[in-house]
């Protein structure tokens, strides 16, 4: 499968990132969970490219449940696919005898599943993370990076939010399984750092998209719906008034942050990862896309569906992520809102 030019450019820019300590990965075995997903795939892609360009003698083990996607990944990248779900992952099922770095990106991210299958969402987050951490301890991993979410902050916060700030979460809410699962997984990660001396870090990502995110019609996240409207020349339809603030991050920027955390992050700590300058309301984001990406050829309209609650949308928030902590490690986001959409759409058109 041909790699879009814009995605190839993203990978090259990451390889030339001076803040990443590439030599730390030399002769290492790297386990990437959820490697058939967007973020896991992005990490695996960059590591495989670095292996060639920097002669790192890396071994990349890509874990996932979907065997078809896994075999496709093996055909495209120089990885070894580990066909197993994280809830079944163990030293025996992994077949591994070494893992120097672990990037734990696996998890249920479908909003509809959060509402319809909350037990699976919660157990995948908690039990899956415990299994990954146990495996990391058994294999003597030097670093584990857990991909968490800004949703751990819950409700009731406003203004600039740092990693030490936390809002409230209703455990009985219709989609609380996702943020509760992320909170519990983060707690496990920090606990393993304390008990076993395992070097763990938690990356609280904003809404992540960009080149490398496939145009999968099953993915109904807001950025993909907006981008599809641009391609189709249709008005952008908002299912709410769009007053909630969203914190976003370009996919390649997120991958760079995760690679930095693997070698520079402080053990047992969390880091916000987002382009704080691109934070805006959903309505404002839609207007940017209509005006700057579609060139003013489409409009933004509000059409609230009757089954709104069943769609599992996150409650509206009004906070913006503070990113000074990750920036102190040498990270800077490269792309603003319009460019993020333009690059994702360009990758779809390639």
Task: Describe each PLM feature range.
Residues 1-24, 45, 55-58, 336-350:
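Amphipathic terminal alpha-helices
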Residues 29-49:
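N-terminal Rossmann NAD(P)H-binding glycine-rich loop of SDR-like oxidoreductase domains
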Residues 85-124:
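NAD(P)H-binding glycine-rich loop region in Rossmannoid oxidoreductase-like domains
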Residues 113-114, 167-174, 200-215, 225-249, ...:
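A conserved pocket-lining segment of Rossmann-fold NAD(P)-dependent short-chain dehydrogenase/reductase
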Residues 130-177:
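Conserved Rossmann-fold NAD(P)-dependent oxidoreductase catalytic core, especially the SDR/UDP-sugar
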Residues 149, 186-212:
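Conserved beta-loop-beta element that borders a ligand/cofactor-binding pocket
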Residues 177, 181-184:
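Active-site helix of classical SDR
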Residues 230-234, 238-350:
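C-terminal substrate-binding subdomain of Rossmann-fold SDR/epimerase-dehydratase oxidoreductases
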């Amino acid at each position: 499968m041909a790699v879009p030019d814009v995605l190839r450019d993203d990978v090259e820019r990451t390889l030339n990132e001076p803040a990443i300590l590439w030599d730390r990965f030399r002769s290492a075995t790297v386990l990437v969970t959820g490697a058939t997903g967007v973020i896991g795939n992005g990490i695996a892609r960059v590591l495989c490219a670095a292996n060639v360009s920097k002669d790192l003698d890396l071994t990349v083990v890509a874990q996932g449940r979907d065997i078809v996607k896994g075999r496709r990944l093996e055909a495209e990248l120089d990885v070894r696919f580990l066909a197993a779900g994280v809830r079944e992952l163990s030293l025996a099922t992994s077949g591994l005898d070494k893992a120097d770095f672990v990037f734990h990106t696996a998890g249920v991210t479908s909003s509809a599943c959060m509402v319809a299958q909350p037990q699976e969402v919660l157990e995948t987050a908690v039990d899956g993370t415990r299994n990954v951490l146990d495996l990391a301890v058994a294999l003597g991993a030097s670093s584990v990076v857990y991909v968490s979410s800004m949703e751990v902050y819950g409700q009731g916060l406003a203004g600039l939010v740092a990693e030490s700030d936390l809002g409230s979460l209703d455990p009985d809410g219709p989609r609380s399984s996702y943020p509760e699962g992320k909170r519990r997984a983060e707690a496990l990660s920090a606990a393993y750092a304390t008990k076993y001396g395992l070097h763990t870090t938690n990356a609280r990502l904003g809404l992540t998209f960009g080149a490398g995110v496939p145009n999968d019609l099953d993915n109904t996240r807001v950025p993909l719906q907006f981008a599809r409207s641009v391609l189709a020349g249709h008005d952008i339809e908002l299912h709410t008034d769009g007053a909630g603030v969203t914190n976003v991050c370009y996919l390649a920027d997120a991958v760079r942050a995760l690679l930095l955390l693997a070698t520079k992050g402080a053990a047992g700590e969390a880091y916000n990862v987002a382009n704080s300058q691109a934070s805006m309301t959903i309505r404002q984001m839609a207007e940017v896309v209509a005006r700057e990406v579609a060139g003013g050829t489409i409009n933004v309209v509000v059409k609230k569906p009757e089954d709104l609650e069943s769609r599992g949308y996150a409650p509206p928030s009004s906070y913006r992520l503070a990113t000074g902590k990750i920036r102190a490690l040498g990270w800077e986001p490269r792309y603003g809102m319009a460019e993020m959409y333009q690059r994702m759409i360009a990758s779809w058109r390639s």
